[in-house]
Regions:
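Alpha-helical secondary-structure segments
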Residues: 26-29, 113-120, 150-154, 205-206, ...
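Surface-exposed binding/hinge segments that line
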Residues: 134-186
Length: 550
């Protein structure tokens, strides 16, 4: 600020032309969403896009505290919008009420009402629909509404995060209910969010989807039904460039104005770009609740043996990878719980790089040194499995190759086969078609109970229409019990030992191999202000009305 003031005094006093009007902002990201439906599949590209176009009831803000976005007041026991009660079968339950924000409308001018949330609740309760967050809908056993702006859910248990509506968001009942009622199981492929994406009646945020070029870009325009603060740009283009080198080239050529850190350049690439470009762009490095890891398919007999999983982790020098590729800016992970999370256990087991111990575990598991340096079991089978990640992400592919070499040094063959993100997430992972390991990231929120990724009921199956994100197929009765008990304990001090035990199980059993907690690199033009990275699963796009042109 001082440097700016000095420069102004030293310069001749002349009339300055107004800054050029900027009607369009072009944003580069590295994935294209496989669907735009708010409740189907879990993908960062979709969540980032929906931040501009679909207003949730609640979200965690940049300060990691819960906020009302589509509601007017957060429910609490103190204000009476949350009430303890007894369920019809005699269990402790909770009645929670949200009131919709006044003036909330869909893009065609139709008010958002309780009926839109009733439809979302009914579709979520019909598990053949395949919505994510199945436990939320199972627990919410009754929907009540006294008026068009009032929504009450009765839950069959008490939970500490009751004020958060999570992914329980309005869906335009007049448009989507007929499609759903015609074919509940086939609804995910018939929804207007993917077949008529430009219908303004689907969108309730500051922007609406105006056009989609599948696999390439999504055009957003100001939503005429939006009654909140006006966003700065008439039009936003979200451009998907899966190859990060190509994305950087488009940024330098001015074909994109900014790269969203939520899904943008890897840290090492951004650091190198900042060194080369000086002050041309603004860079912000935001540490957050983003967990890079390798999911392992535990139905694979090789990976079903916990000794093999432990050996794989011992055989990776994660500290060296972080230091050489990321300048030490990303903390090595012990579990999926970030060290800054209030429930992180500093005493959780850690697996240092120890190739000798890794080889001893493989010997113990029956894998002996074999021809070509790859271990074999008594039946002569090679210790070999497929290793996947998102094609085009240069940093992930580089990490993958480094890990492949480290594993080969202990006698393990990892066969690399990568896929574009929209295929990997929409089909291979969500339908558990991967057979070995898959390197990707999960994004969470503060004190997020990992039900969808670790509870045995969340293993995706055809019968569940592939809902759930327990891609490894992890089954552990104690883990299930902890995940069910944790949300019901309102006292943080009493939750702490439950969290510690949950972390101990994941660190010992290793359904996924923890790598590091990621810092995201946000790259903005100098003329853009107001973007506030959050570091968690409610992305900066939710606060687009705060973005301004300097």
């Amino acid at each position: 600020m001082a440097a700016v003031a000095i420069s102004a005094i030293a310069s001749p006093v002349t009339a300055q032309p107004p800054p050029p009007a900027r009607e369009q902002l072009t944003i580069g990201i590295t994935q294209f969403p496989s669907t735009l439906h708010p409740n189907i599949e879990s993908m960062v590209a979709k969540s980032y896009t929906l931040g501009f176009t679909h207003l949730p009831l609640t979200a965690y803000g940049p300060d990691w505290t819960l906020q009302c976005l589509g509601c007017d007041t957060l429910p609490s026991l103190e204000n009476g919008q949350a009430v303890r009660e007894t369920t019809p079968d005699g269990k402790p339950g909770l009645r929670v009420t949200w009131r919709l924000r006044e003036g909330l409308r869909w893009g065609d001018g139709t008010p958002v009402t309780a009926e839109d949330l009733r439809f979302a609740w009914e579709a979520g309760r019909a598990f053949e629909t395949g919505f994510g967050g199945a436990e939320f809908y199972r627990s919410a056993y009754e929907f009540l509404s006294d008026d068009p702006r009032s929504v009450t859910l009765r839950f069959d248990k008490v939970t500490f995060d009751y004020a958060s509506a999570g992914n329980f968001v309005p869906l335009p009942a007049r448009l989507e209910r007929p499609r759903w009622e015609a074919d509940k199981r086939g609804y995910r492929s018939r929804t207007g969010y993917d077949t008529e994406s430009a219908n303004p009646g689907l969108w309730s945020g500051p922007y609406r989807v105006a056009g989609v070029q599948p696999g390439a870009s999504i055009a957003l325009e100001r939503n005429p039904g939006w009654t909140g603060p006006a966003p700065a740009f008439q039009r936003i283009i979200i451009r998907a460039v899966e190859n990060t080198a190509a994305l950087e080239a488009q940024l330098l050529a001015g074909q994109v104005d900014m790269v969203a850190g939520e899904l943008g350049l890897p840290l090492d690439q951004a650091i190198a770009l900042e060194r080369r470009t000086g002050s041309r762009f603004r860079f912000e490095y935001k540490p957050g609740l983003v967990w890079e890891h390798i999911d392992l398919n535990l139905d694979n007999p090789v990976l079903a043996d916990v000794r093999v999983r432990q050996a794989l982790l011992l055989g990776m020098d994660r500290g060296r990878i972080v230091q050489s590729l990321y300048g030490g800016r990303q903390p090595v992970a012990a579990t999926g719980i970030h060290p800054d999370d209030p429930m992180s256990d500093p005493e959780v087991r850690r697996w240092p790089f120890d190739p000798a111990r890794a080889q001893a575990l493989l010997e113990e598991a029956g894998w002996k040194p074999g021809e070509g340096g790859i271990r074999r079991n008594a039946a002569g089978e090679r210790l070999s499995f497929e290793f996947m990640t998102t094609a085009g992400n240069r940093a992930r592919e580089q990490v993958q190759q480094v890990i492949q070499g480290m594993w080969r040094a202990i006698g393990v063959e990892a066969r690399i086969r990568n896929e574009p993100p929209r295929v990997l997430f929409a089909e291979t992972l969500s339908q558990r078609r991967f057979t070995g390991g898959a390197l990707f990231a999960w994004v969470s929120s503060p004190e997020n109970v990992p039900r969808s990724t670790l509870h045995s009921s969340e293993i995706p199956t055809a019968e569940r229409n592939w809902s759930g994100q327990n891609y490894p197929g992890f089954r552990n009765a104690e883990m299930d019990a902890l995940i069910e008990a944790l949300p019901e304990e309102l006292d943080p001090a009493k939750r702490r030992p439950l969290w510690a035990r949950l972390q101990a199980i994941t660190a010992e059993q290793l359904p996924a191999l923890p790598l590091w907690h990621r810092a995201d690199a946000h790259v903005w033009p100098q003329w853009l202000d107001g973007v506030r990275p959050t570091g968690h699963l409610n992305f900066s796009s939710l606060w687009v009305t705060e973005w301004k042109v300097r």
